[in-house]
UniProtKB/Swiss-Prot annotation:
Protein name: Type II methylase M.HgiDII
Active site: C79
Domain of life where this protein originates: Bacteria
Enzyme Commission number(s) from the entry: 2.1.1.37
Family, similarity comment: Belongs to the class I-like SAM-binding methyltransferase superfamily. C5-methyltransferase family.
A family per Pfam: DNA_methylase
Enzyme class (EC, first level): transferase
Source organism (scientific name): Herpetosiphon aurantiacus (Herpetosiphon giganteus)
Boundaries of every SAM-dependent MTase C5-type domain copy: 3-344
Reactions listed under catalytic activity: a 2'-deoxycytidine in DNA + S-adenosyl-L-methionine = a 5-methyl-2'-deoxycytidine in DNA + S-adenosyl-L-homocysteine + H(+)
InterPro entries named in the record: C5-Methyltransferase (IPR050390), C5_DNA_meth_AS (IPR018117), C5_MeTfrase (IPR001525), C5_meth_CS (IPR031303), SAM-dependent_MTases_sf (IPR029063)
Coiled-coil intervals: none
Gene: hgiDIIM
Keywords linked to the UniProt accession: DNA-binding, Methyltransferase, Restriction system, S-adenosyl-L-methionine, Transferase
Length: 354
């Protein structure tokens, strides 16, 4: 085991799963959403603690860490208040979760910390929230680094940019170099091209997650007139919604769109099961992408289960998938920490020899 990890705001376990695949031992995941418990525990074989972070005490988490392992604390605070998709409110309360994260860091004093979030967290409230968080870490003696990751550069097949922060007391952790270039980005075809044909409202018997939302008649007609990468402007006049005919509607070109086979997907959101919620139409089949396809584009393994058989709820699972840290990004974070620890151990070994 490389190190012992506790995952705050763990959701269904995207970050946890990436860490486990890279050899880390995850002691527990903490989240206040009880619907995530099944997927988290079923796929990761570790403990799910249903609590709000404000209810968590550092002493109870410290008791979980073994004495002979590096203590690692990771988390992805809910990002809706920071995201460009929710600019309406600039006075939200979810940023206070960073304050709670900072409190737990003070109480636990982990060896290594990692946080993943949207890039907008750096400028939210004129940068005050993020800068205060960094200052609190530095005051505790941590070396802090952060960078914006363009997910396709690391084999994640969607247009997703994420802020990744590291902090360690024994040096600076740097993110590993990119593994892909635009010439060999993983595409929609690479990831979902082999799945069975499906249809609007269809379920595939071999996988309950390969299920697509049922389209209303008008939306079925719309997707039949949609081309990959196109917009609602490609439709006949009678299919265009009145709101899109207004000047203000021109800025919503990606809604009711199809993905393109040989490009990366758009950002997978919490409403990725709906054709009208973004460019979530299948590249050639007349339907929205299925839940399994959305999960694969978030780099979850095909075997990842999100609900017990017969208890699948579209909106719940779609939200879980959209909120998740892509598993492959979890592996990038894990590899970056592992490389740092290997370098640290090598330096310590050299000192002993000398």
């Amino acid at each position: 085991m490389v190190g012992a990890v506790i995952d705050l705001f763990c959701g269904v376990g995207g970050l946890t799963h990436g860490l486990i695949l890279e050899g880390f031992g995850v002691l527990a995941g903490i989240d206040n959403d009880p619907s995530c418990k099944y997927a988290y525990e079923q796929n990761n074989r570790t403990r799910f603690i249903e609590k709000s972070i404000s209810e968590v005490d550092g002493r109870e988490l410290n008791a979980l860490y073994p004495n002979n392992q590096h203590k690692i604390l990771v988390g992805c605070a809910p990002c809706q208040d920071f995201s460009q998709y929710t600019k309406k409110s600039r006075t939200g309360t979810k940023w206070q979760l960073l304050t709670e994260f900072s409190r737990l860091i003070r109480e636990i004093e982990p060896d290594i910390i990692s946080m993943e979030n949207v890039p907008e967290v750096r400028t939210f409230n004129r940068g005050e929230v993020f800068n205060n968080f960094i200052q609190s870490l530095e005051q505790l003696g941590y070396h802090v680094s952060h960078s914006v990751v363009h997910c396709p550069d690391y084999g994640i097949p969607q247009q997703r940019d994420r802020l990744v922060l590291f902090a360690a007391k024994q040096g600076v952790i740097k993110i590993i170099p990119p593994t892909h270039t635009p010439e060999n980005y993983r595409t929609v075809r690479d990831v979902i091209g082999s799945l069975a044909t499906n249809y609007s409202g269809g379920h595939w018997e071999g996988d309950s997650m390969h299920a697509a939302s049922r389209l209303e008649d008008i939306n079925l007609r719309r997707i039949q007139h949609s081309v990959p990468g196109g917009t609602w402007a490609d439709w006949p006049e009678e299919l265009i919604a009145e709101c899109h005919k207004k000047e203000s509607g021109e800025s919503y070109g990606s809604v009711y769109g199809r993905m393109e086979w040989d490009k990366v997907a758009p950002t997978i959101t919490t409403q990725c099961n709906g054709y009208g919620n973004g460019r979530f139409g299948h590249p050639e089949q007349d339907r929205a992408i299925s839940l399994r396809e959305a999960a694969l584009l978030q780099t979850f393994p095909r075997s990842y289960q999100f609900a017990p058989e017969g208890q699948l709820k579209f909106k719940t699972v779609s939200r879980q998938i959209g909120n998740a840290v892509p598993v492959a990004l979890g592996r990038v974070i894990a590899k970056s920490i592992k490389r740092f620890l290997e370098g640290l151990h090598e330096r310590q070994r050299v000192r002993i020899i000398i």
